[in-house]
Amino acid sequence: MSEGTLYDKVWDRHTVTKLPTGQDQLFVGLHLVHEVTSPQAFGMLKERDQEVAFPERTHATVDHIVPTGNRDRPYRDEAAENMMAELEANVRGSGIDFSDPDSGNQGIVHVIGPEQGLTQPGMTIVCGDSHTSTHGAFGALAFGIGTSQIRDVLATGCIAMEKQQVRKIEVTGELGEGVTAKDVILTIIGKLGTDGGVGYVYEYAGEAIEDLGMEGRMSICNMSIEGGARAGYVNPDETTYEWLAETDAFADDPEKFERLKPYWESIRSDADAEYDDVVTIDGSAIEPTVTWGTTPGQTAGITEPIPDPDDLPEEDRDTAKRAQKHMRVEPGDTMEGYDIDVAFLGSCTNARLKDLREAAAFVEGREVDDDVRAMVVPGSQRVRDAAEAEGIDEIFIEAGFDWREPGCSMCLGMNDDQLVGDEASASSSNRNFVGRQGSKDGRTVLMSPIMVAAAAVTGEVTDVREMEEVATV
């Protein structure tokens, strides 16, 4: 087993006891709650006449079902209104801080945690959402959990978990023009597979990772679960500390920041740490990358041919054939030129201010293709407000994008923003499963925000490097 890694250090410091099951009981530093996976857990507490053990370590928001258009209450969708009302009652009855739509702080749970400084290095973080691994970008151990585990954490502040192995993924070299963190993680999943990380936590390292800002690191850690890993993280460094210093937690309390910084530095993986596996990927060889199929592992560089299923391992052939039939693609073709109907820029993977800035810089002076409906859904109210202060909203609106309120939106078919029929979308989200964006016949192509912007203006999947004024992001 691994030794001397950040994962080992943080795990050991949060272990309360070894359980008879062989699992460890871990103390949870931060529990993030949203409207979809928490009602049943709160209901179980009420049945047992239990209270939330650590409301001060719990924070709630609404994101999955909240409309990104008309937000007048009651919501048009009765189920959404009921979930919202139940969350409001549960959190306020428990004394839990709530970033509600009237607070100015509402947003996707994995966007608001980092921007408010709730997410910090060396913490254990859980949430009833698959993409909780996002917070690992700060050097935290962050895990998605199920309903019964949500109940356990609410009631005790602890969770039972089995320790994983640690795989170090080194991305060496410098990323090229038009290549982003999203391309890096799609490449990693494409190489290792959607189940390649089962039993592992991923530590991301190497020059290409170190050169990324926090937004890029969050995009990579966000999709760790899509590669089968239980979590993913990046060791904290000066880039991390600079972000944290400007958050609510520390902007007005620099002394607190200085007190905690030595701890953050101490949890970094040792120079001689031992890993269970090490994978090295040449970052300079990565090109803009998109999905061609119906899993995040079915990827190809924009100039690479779609594989022939018969050339794949036997266990992957049938899945690939079904995916190619659904997506209407042929082996040997590339995804460049694939027609799209919808361009979606949003989700917990890619809806932060930097994502919007870079896409807007590309879009400025261009127009959305006449046959494309395009939308931008900021990750939080703070992101939206900051973007509007910079005039980013006007750039998108003038180009023909719909500028919306924050929420999960078209990442999943759980709100009003959905594909219709067999529409094909260029999406900056994290999952391209059949039916994920609301229509069982819909087709989703995952890509970076700047690639979404390029697809929106051309009406097809486009190699952004072939267009003018492309920045390295």
Curated annotation (Swiss-Prot):
Residues 307-317 have a biased composition (Acidic residues). This is 3-isopropylmalate dehydratase large subunit. HAMAP family: LeuC_type1. Heterodimer of LeuC and LeuD. One of its GO terms (molecular function) is 4 iron, 4 sulfur cluster binding. Pathway: Amino-acid biosynthesis; L-leucine biosynthesis; L-leucine from 3-methyl-2-oxobutanoate: step 2/4. Its cofactor is [4Fe-4S] cluster. Belongs to the aconitase/IPM isomerase family. LeuC type 1 subfamily. It catalyses: (2R,3S)-3-isopropylmalate = (2S)-2-isopropylmalate. It holds the Pfam family Aconitase. Residues 289-319 are annotated as: Disordered. Residues 291-301 have a biased composition (Polar residues). The keyword Coiled coil does not apply. The keyword 4Fe-4S applies. Coiled coil: none annotated. GO terms for biological process: L-leucine biosynthetic process. SUPFAM superfamilies: Aconitase iron-sulfur domain. Keywords: 4Fe-4S, Amino-acid biosynthesis, Branched-chain amino acid biosynthesis, Iron, Iron-sulfur, Leucine biosynthesis, Lyase, Metal-binding. Binds 1 [4Fe-4S] cluster per subunit. It is an enzyme of class 4 (lyase). Catalyzes the isomerization between 2-isopropylmalate and 3-isopropylmalate, via the formation of 2-isopropylmaleate. Its EC number is 4.2.1.33. [4Fe-4S] cluster binds at C348, C408, C411.
